[in-house]
């Protein structure tokens, strides 16, 4: 039996995920720049939606890259 993953944001009592907190957002992005799914990270549906929105805003404002590198 595997241990059930716990939502880090619920434990910390976070009200909203801030798009300016780039260091926290980087933990939920793969090396290729994709958003890690909640079944892997264990985040609840509420915070996964906020996380996706925050990552997309940070990408739009060039705080985070859309992808890791470009191939020719």
Swiss-Prot record:
The keyword Cell cycle does not apply. GO terms for molecular function: small ribosomal subunit rRNA binding; structural constituent of ribosome. It comes from the Bacteria. Keywords: Ribonucleoprotein, Ribosomal protein, RNA-binding, rRNA-binding. Pfam families: Ribosomal_S18. One of its GO terms (cellular component) is cytosolic small ribosomal subunit. InterPro entries: Ribosomal_bS18, Ribosomal_bS18_CS, Ribosomal_bS18_sf. GO terms for biological process: translation. Part of the 30S ribosomal subunit. Forms a tight heterodimer with protein bS6. Binds as a heterodimer with protein bS6 to the central domain of the 16S rRNA, where it helps stabilize the platform of the 30S subunit. Belongs to the bacterial ribosomal protein bS18 family. This is Small ribosomal subunit protein bS18. It comes from Francisella tularensis subsp. tularensis (strain SCHU S4 / Schu 4). The gene is rpsR.
């Amino acid at each position: 039996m595997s241990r059930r993953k716990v939502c880090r944001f619920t434990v910390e009592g976070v009200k909203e995920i801030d798009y300016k907190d780039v260091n926290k957002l980087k933990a939920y992005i793969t090396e290729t720049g994709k958003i890690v799914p909640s079944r892997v990270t264990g985040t609840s549906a509420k915070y996964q939606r906020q996380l996706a929105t925050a990552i997309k805003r940070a990408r739009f404002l060039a705080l985070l890259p859309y992808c890791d590198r470009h191939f020719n």
